[in-house]
Amino acid sequence: MDTKIEIMRENPLFLSNFTPKYAKMNATTTYHTPVLLSESVDLLAIDPDGTYVDLTFGGGGHSRYILSKLSERGRLYSFDQDPDAKANCPDDPRFHFVESNFRFLRGALRYRGVEQVDGILADLGVSSHHFDCTERGFSFRGEAPLDMRMYYRNGRSAADIVNEADAETLTRIFGEWGEIDTPYKAANCIVRARATAPILTTAQLVEAVAPCTPRKDESKFLTKLFQALRIEVNGEMEALKMALEQSLKMLRP
């Protein structure tokens, strides 16, 4: 199964044709150090000869720690759909990098001859690396294309959603994924702003929702707004549900 969705648009209004500089960056130094590293990995009760999966490779912190506990017969399969993560892969014959969204867990491992595994780890959320790479559009600080895709050719960008979705859909996104108190206000602000000009950058989005942004909690409000869009763009909740269902079928008793 081809796990890369190649959806390209010709309309210059949207950003699906945008190929960012970050695709060729070496991002090793900008990933955060995993929190509770030993505590989380130790809960896997590593069998040195076992087969393990890291669903969120990122900077490779968890994967390297798991590798340190494996024997020569042990195996680790680490997933990440972000091309930047490939720069962090260890040179280790026990390590296998899977450039894919973890929603394809079972199919990707079966393709590699793996039917069952001894443990699966996921460090969910977004890495500090994504905020540090301002050109990716994950942060509301500064000016950047409104993209937010973990894989830069993977379906719709945040700009596509902001400019295409109706007020009802935007309200659902901001309420469900961002838990914003008044999501309909943010949705209406966006609909009004884009009627004048398309919203293509992070700064333009911040400006569009300025009329409904609480001054005392501006940072918190924008954090929730951007989080909601990121989750929608990348289908994070659907991917997690699929991965959990597949994990139950792949874990050894």
Question: Which residues are covered by each model-predicted region?
Answer:
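S-adenosyl-L-methionine-dependent methyltransferase catalytic core, i.e., the SAM/SAH-binding region
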Residues: 6, 14, 18-253
